[in-house]
Amino acid sequence: MVRVAVSGAAGNIGSTAVEAFQNGKYDVTPITHREHEGMDSVVLNVEDRDAFVEALAGHDAVVHLAGRADPTASWEDVLRTNIEGTYSAFEAALVNDLDRLVFASSNHFHGMINIDESDRPETLTATPQAVYPDDPMRPDSYYGVSKITGEALGSYYADRHGLEVVNLRIGWFLTEAELEEKLSEPENVARFARAIWLSPRDCRRAVRRAVEASLPENPLSVNLTSDNESRYFSLARTINSLGYHSEDDSSSVV
């Protein structure tokens, strides 16, 4: 049985990722920064490398989702949790000789490409251009910068140490009810939500494939949204490299 650890397991995406591995094929270890009622988890601060090393002992892969998921976060906030914490995750994976690390990157890696208001990261122009994984980085926030740094770390650990790395550039993870609420916001925010929505069901499928799939290249960076009618992030590499198939579309919800 494959042993998978999931950091940030109490978050919205983290708890969904844990569900993805509760199918009898995996032994999943949730990692959280504090205790949560109803969840049996390993509790640690992701900046504590020694604790992270201990937590990953005996595992085959780690899905690293822990971090400050906020495009308004300060440099100090992302430096500690997103950058130092991600370094700890890679070091812990290396020390324990894990096969693979799946990194929760973000659409904010390319956030400035189609932004409608440069000081509001989650807005979308009325005529967005297609965005591909190999397009030059254009972060829209310190949060986006922290994800670029995480991917750079992944490139180093893949090339130098042979660790398999998958970077999932996640869209906007929302339940259907949350997506519907976004439509009451300004139109450029609603456009953004419709275009880059990632449903919980598609998230589970993608995270599982990121652990299971044979990689055509290492590291592998892919966009991750649902198959939305108005999406502008290309999913071609996600489909071809991971075998990801979305079943959801924001246009069928709103």
Language-model regions: role of each:
Residues 142, 146-149:
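Active-site helix of classical SDR
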Residues 105, 151-176:
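Conserved beta-loop-beta element that borders a ligand/cofactor-binding pocket
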Residues 81-86, 90, 102-105, 146, ...:
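Short alpha-helix in the Rossmann-fold core of NAD(P)-dependent oxidoreductases
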Residues 90-140:
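Conserved Rossmann-fold NAD(P)-dependent oxidoreductase catalytic core, especially the SDR/UDP-sugar
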Residues 172-188, 196-219, 227:
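Alpha-helical substrate-binding/gating segment
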Residues 2-24:
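N-terminal Rossmann NAD(P)H-binding glycine-rich loop of SDR-like oxidoreductase domains
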